Amino acid sequence: MGIRVINVKVRGGEAKPAPPLAPAIEKLGLDVNKVVEDINKATEKYKGFEVAVKLIVDENTKEYEIEVKPPTTTELLLKAVGASEPSGDPMHQKIGDLPFEKIVEIAILKKPSLNAKTLKAAVKTILGSARSIGITVDGKDPKQVTKEVEEGLYDAVLAKYEEEWEKA
């Protein structure tokens, strides 16, 4: 006996104590309802998205750890603008517009999977993704918004989210 890993996809905050999850958990001698409850807590902030969950179980102690892989940046951006797919021609055909604050919120959600050390760097990454799929930000090309972020024009907005970034 050692470490067992179970990989599943669940809708954020909506895992159910049913197959394929329940039998795999039961087989390891864990309380299915408790594990599902913990998975739902861990995935709650991704409500409406399908996320990959890795359940790492120590078969000896029955202790477990839950790792959640957040949705892709593209998925988060598309859902935010209500689009089903990226623009085929993002420079000329826009699929939607988002407020800068929404870009910041997505950056915070993506923190675990981004290599960004600061909120400002994470926001610039998300702005690049928005541009590549045809989304404008506050009615502007995300490239322009990125320049404005670098110039400090959004520092006050970013400061409001700094604490949330640190906790993420």
Curated annotation (Swiss-Prot):
GO MF assignments: large ribosomal subunit rRNA binding; structural constituent of ribosome
UniProt entry tagged with the keyword RNA-binding: yes
Coiled coil: none
GO terms of biological process kind: translation
Organism domain of life: Archaea
Keywords: Ribonucleoprotein, Ribosomal protein, RNA-binding, rRNA-binding
Listed Pfam families: Ribosomal_L11, Ribosomal_L11_N
GO CC terms, sorted: large ribosomal subunit
Record's function text: Forms part of the ribosomal stalk which helps the ribosome interact with GTP-bound translation factors.
Assembly notes: Part of the ribosomal stalk of the 50S ribosomal subunit. Interacts with L10 and the large rRNA to form the base of the stalk. L10 forms an elongated spine to which L12 dimers bind in a sequential fashion forming a multimeric L10(L12)X complex.
PANTHER family: 60S RIBOSOMAL PROTEIN L12 (PTHR11661), LARGE RIBOSOMAL SUBUNIT PROTEIN UL11M (PTHR11661:SF1)
Similarity comment: Belongs to the universal ribosomal protein uL11 family.
UniProt name for this protein: Large ribosomal subunit protein uL11
